[in-house]
Amino acid sequence: MSAARRKEKRMSVLNGLEPKSVFKFFEDISAIPRGSGNTKAVSDYLAEFARVRGLEHYQDELNNIIIIAPATEGYENAEPVIIQGHMDMVCEKAPDCAKDMEKEGLDLAVEGDVVFARGTTLGADDGIAVAMALAVLDSKELPHPRVEAVITVDEEVGMDGAMGIDLSPLKGKMLINIDSEDEGIFTVSCAGGAHVECTLPAAREDFDGQALDIAVTGLLGGHSGAEIDKGRANANMLMGRLLYALGKATEFRLVSVRGGLKDNAIPTASYAAVIVSDADAAKAVCAEMEAQFKDEYRVNDGAICVSVSAGERAPALDKAATEKAVCMLVCMPNGIQAMSADIAGLVQTSLNLGILTTREDAVCASFSVRSSVASQKRMLIDRLECLTAQLGGTVSISGDYPGWAYRQDSPLRDLMAEVFTEQYSHAPTIAAIHAGLECGLFLGKKPELDCVSLGPDIDEIHTFREKLHIASTQRTWALLTETLKRMK
């Protein structure tokens, strides 16, 4: 089958759906492989879209693109508006799917009220934002102020595009981000964050005693932003408590301690290799601590298990290094540190000890620090630096990105809420998330921005079961276009 015939076949899948232009552009970009890190082709498609229409545009070396449409008649003096989303998608597929997502487009399908891709992720996160932005830019009938479409790359793997983009071509101070997956919810704040690694130097020595392996397992874990408020245990922190109790019962040396794979995930298990003077006392401590943990977390994390078994002898951390490692685990803050004063139930500030490792000469603890208030994030980083310095260690900070603080005064939020209420006969839900969004990075570059994030209903993003709801897309498009119309 020729490439032209394949494209024709793809185009026929969504051809009857409304809004026609939105689904046309969604189908166009769905024919282009656009996983994170593989965005050159789709970026070039967007640049060609702009070139053919004579639209001002900027494409950078990262493949980010800005496309600008001038104001329509009567809107020349209106404030410009930014429409923003990301072009990359998460590429996941069913176990029996043979598609090469690096080279092949998606096989779209419609069933009832949903669009999906056969065997793979759909990429409505965030292809629907790209499609809506293009539909606005392409329209000859839609009234609007100057529209500045900002379409970034690699949001799904660290927001690298938003970090690197130059926003100097933009005149707009209002930004509509179309990267939310729940219709009727306006996100108006998000957390900033940083990765903080605390490293304690460690000398080793021979220590007489019995080698034991201790494991804390069975925890639920979860995302350290979205699920930090669920009252679940952190396996690394529990291991710190256990080791401190062990030191009260018998002399011991730590050989290694490890737990967790990602600093933005609450660790479900933690493991320590130790050499103890009194094995029976150590086993009694493990049994006692298991009972304590089960009781404390019986509602939110009730399957915690502490096991102990014979280990292999190896050179251990010396007494000072063992004590400092345990002290770090006991004294470092973890979990929720502050709740929002503006939005009920929202976590404002938190941190998570997500990765714990031991090298030959060091013990390392990696934290994910989050806050929607920049000074609170800095305060937590300062605490980690101070505690680590007192223990003779060093701290490295990476991936520092700004948050998006809630604005009491938001003309964009007020306008969109007014339009929403008229269309839906009820007010939107005003929400915030304790995780990062590109809006936070843009605010770091342009603090004057007034942002709202919204989107149509998308189910099971980042899985091959992802589905975009058609009717929800229609309503979201109507909300967007009416908002633009009222910006005169």
Question: Where on the chain are the PLM-derived regions?
Answer:
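Fold-level recognition of mixed alpha/beta catalytic cores in primary-metabolism enzymes, strongest
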Residues: 144-235, 247
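Acidic/His- and Gly-rich active-site-bordering loop/insert found
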Residues: 7-9, 13-114
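Active-site metal-coordination/substrate-binding segment of hydrolases
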Residues: 75-157, 162-173, 195, 208-211, ...
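Zn-dependent metallopeptidase/amidohydrolase metal-coordination segment
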Residues: 19-22, 341, 348-363, 368, ...
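Active-site-adjacent substrate-binding region
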Residues: 234-237, 241-257, 406-449
